[in-house]
Design a protein with these regions (language model features):
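Sec-dependent N-terminal signal peptides
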Residues: 6-9
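Exposed acidic/polar residues on beta-strands and adjacent loops within beta-sheet cores, strongest
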Residues: 18-164
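N-terminal signal peptide c-region/cleavage motif recognized by signal peptidases
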Residues: 13-15
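Positively charged n-region of N-terminal signal peptides that target proteins for export
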Residues: 1-4
Length: 164
């Protein structure tokens, strides 16, 4: 009887955990003025006004999230978005982007159907990573990368694949 209870609790616990599987989108130029990353159902677009040379960020709004079929789009204003920090969850319902300004940065989670902001985490330093279903943020870092951080702040992703 106890084995069945433990098995039931283990199954319940496993089903209560999120299965977010955020993955980085490759943001590539479709034209010199338009950079795009796409999943199966969602496409992310950034306007680019620096038409010569390599681009590592997009300082001009808006960021557009567009359905691949039907073309319906919504827009996010503001931000200087990093090209190498655009992630889409496995269900393509949430988009995670890193942005920065002169005073710091942030990670922002958006709903891909409405562009509504779902969550935001401040990044006084740029060191962070997704490790399974946890968002790990480095604090008091001497260099880039979590290995160089004195402190680590861990946010477990909830059922909606958002940091708690």
């Amino acid at each position: 009887m106890n084995r069945f209870l433990l098995l039931g609790l283990a199954l319940l616990s496993a089903s209560a955990q999120a299965d977010c599987a955020y993955r980085a989108l490759a943001i590539e130029p479709e034209t010199p003025a338009l950079y795009v990353g796409a999943g199966e159902r969602v496409r992310v677009e950034f306007d680019n006004y620096k038409l010569d040379g390599e681009v590592d960020s997009f300082p001009e709004p808006p960021l557009r999230i567009r359905a691949v079929q039907g073309g319906k789009a919504c827009e996010v204003e503001g931000g200087i978005w990093l090209r190498n920090a655009v992630l889409l969850d496995a269900g393509e319902q949430r988009l995670l982007v890193q942005s920065f300004s002169g005073s710091g940065g942030e990670l922002t989670f958006y709903d891909t159907s409405s562009c509504a902001q779902l969550a935001r985490v401040e990044l006084p330093e740029a060191s962070w990573s997704l490790q399974g279903e946890q968002l790990v943020i480095g604090r008091n870092c001497s260099a880039a990368g979590l290995a160089h951080c004195v402190e680590r702040e861990v946010h477990t992703l909830n059922q909606q694949c958002l940091p708690q």
